[in-house]
Amino acid sequence: MDLLTLLLEKKLADHLTFPETINAHWLAEGVLQLIPHEEGNRSLVISAGIHGNETAPIEILIQLLAQLAEGTLALKNNVLIIFGNLPAMRTNRRYLHDDLNRMFGGRYLNFPLGNERSRAAELENVVNRFFAEPSVSSTNIRWHIDLHTAIRASHHEQFALLPAQNRPFSAEFMQWLHDSDIDALVYHREKAGTFSHFLSEKFGADSCTMEMGKAMPFGENDLTRFQKITDALYGLISLSQITARIKFELKHYQVINSIIKSHDSFQLHIPADTLNFTELPEGFEIASQHDHHWKIKFPAKFILFPNAEVANGLRAGLLLALNKK
């Protein structure tokens, strides 16, 4: 039985074994702590499936675990592997009750009881336990890569969102993002309930939400499209050299405004197939509800994650400015 099937059938912990050079410990269902016997100087959290129907990152992490188990990939750093929303994965849904990636930093307490509220509390707990591990707490380099795929297609297929923080991101982290061959970086400037923001704020990790392409069902992903990102992840874990950037220049965007849906009358005035990072004309009314209208105003001319179907109180889109770098 393949590892993905074992994960979905709640059997992975009983069947997955590793070489003696790796100390493996399951902290919760779908949460695996891996510590090398030879102490590393970096601690990594790599997560996928925070949204259950974003399958390509889950398949990539399964492949990574298979190579570690076979001994074909060496473990040189402390790693916490997280498969986020397992019940949603099993039903090919984004979430069962509420969006898990809006709940971190204790925000889950503001949501009704349900699958995601319980999982957010559990994931916060296991990350605390990981960073309290003596071999982990002694490291001064902490990174978090939260792997996602997007609901819609994009002008920039692969990009990363960086959480708002008062300290600069390390040069090494930014170079790794550059060399992973993503197309764009998006900088948040407000706090959020995302997993990446939680790791940044609570543990001082260099953290990002990495969008790898359009969401597809299990088994329908062409994983060769993500090979450079996969190689970059393997390089992090094994301390192997990754190849330099191949693509054109990395673009940088700043989040200027969030479109927050607060009423059932909310509408987006763009076609359903509008691509992420579409540039819109000055003065265009992109969204409205009974008491508010959102119009495009320079420099925030690019739309990201437009979604009129979100629940009231949640973000229905981001308006971005392109930084000239």
UniProtKB/Swiss-Prot annotation:
Zn(2+) binds at residues 51, 54, 148. It comes from the Bacteria. Pfam families: AstE_AspA_cat (PF24827), AstE_AspA_hybrid (PF04952). Keywords: Arginine metabolism, Hydrolase, Metal-binding, Zinc. Its EC number is 3.5.1.96. GO terms for biological process: arginine catabolic process to glutamate; arginine catabolic process to succinate. This is Succinylglutamate desuccinylase. Transforms N(2)-succinylglutamate into succinate and glutamate. It comes from Photorhabdus laumondii subsp. laumondii (strain DSM 15139 / CIP 105565 / TT01) (Photorhabdus luminescens subsp. laumondii). Belongs to the AspA/AstE family. Succinylglutamate desuccinylase subfamily. It catalyses: N-succinyl-L-glutamate + H2O = L-glutamate + succinate. One of its GO terms (molecular function) is succinylglutamate desuccinylase activity. NCBIfam families: arg_catab_astE, PRK05324.1. Pathway: Amino-acid degradation; L-arginine degradation via AST pathway; L-glutamate and succinate from L-arginine: step 5/5. Its cofactor is Zn(2+). The gene is astE. Signal peptide: none annotated.
